[in-house]
Amino acid sequence: MSQNTYCSPIVYINGKVIDYLESYNFSTAMNNTLQTLKLTFTNPDLENLDLFGEKIELYHNYGSLDGVPLFRGYITQISATDTKITANAQDPRLYLSGQDGITVDTTDSKNYDGMTLTQFLYSFISTEVNADSTVIGLSSLTEIDKPVYMTGIRERHQAPWNLITSTLAKAIDDSNFSEPLDYFIDINHRQTTSDILFRKKSLLADKASYIFSYFDGIVELRYKERPPHNVGVARTKDGETQRFIYGNTPSGKKAITLKGNFETPAEARKAAINKVLLDYNDTKEIDMTVSKCHGISLGTVVYINVPDDNIRGKYRVTGKTISFNNSKVTCKLKCNQKPIRVSDFINN
């Protein structure tokens, strides 16, 4: 599709079509942040409505009519001028942020010991968020390959989102030593519900789902790279330090120290290795303006086919923004770097 492909977005607030849409900006990223949507209307009637907290849906309709919304969420902020009204919204996971007073308290007498993170999330949403109606769908929520447990977690007045993300960070599938894979929290907008789910990053060795080139899909491409952490440092509870060095460090050593103490030297070393390898996958950043795949999911593996050897290859999609303004549509994708190599390991 070209950049000039027809786009006919439709916005619903509480199931009612809202006219006079002037612009919007949609953003999503693979870093456990919420999807956001900012819209501007020139509809004078909206000023008389109490829109805060109301349900909003955006159908992008780029080139064809969409069967599911690009975004579904709830309005978190409204501002108005003499001629325009701006609304900000976040996806339904905002009800796990603690802003509405729903927090998690775990004590020795009341806790989630023995539950996996997935089981806890299902139980918590069912009883605390979806008590009166389905705010966050659960039909897409399944157990992860490497379950993490809530055993021993004790928190007071903790925001559910913080507890979920910090616990999920412990889940790493390191069955492929050369490319450990972590998980992120995503939202799947279906016809009537928006379902929360855990996604594992795809192996970069997998077949690319889409190919982008300057002849097919790439409107503009920007590239930058930062030095990766090549040294991981972790400590045991008794103070023993474990270090892992990746590669021959020709440009010098850049260390990252893990928070927390580990039970054994083996656990500390394993954590240091995983941290370095996970961070290595996020040092090369590609920003592409694209004319296709506006509905692409986070974590999707794509192949960027460009003349530059340093850029050409497979990447994961780590972020997406879509902007609409006066019928002009711009879609931008963020992608991360190529896979690492087992031959680069040095065990010190």
PLM features per residue range, with description:
Residues M1, V11, L39-F41, I75, ...:
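Short low-polarity hydrophobic stretches
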Residues M1-D105, A169-K170, S202-L221:
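Assembly/oligomerization scaffold segments
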Residues G101, V342-N348:
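C-terminal output/interaction extensions
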Residues E54-I56, M115, T300:
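Surface-exposed loop/turn positions
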Residues T83-Y223:
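Charged- and aromatic-enriched interaction segments used to assemble
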Residues L70, K84, R156, H229, ...:
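Short edge beta-strand segments in beta-sheet-rich domains
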Residues L37-T40, K84-Q90, S194-L197, D287-T289, ...:
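A generic structural motif
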Residues M1-T5, K110, E179-S327, Q337-D344:
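Acidic, small/polar-enriched beta strand-loop surface segments
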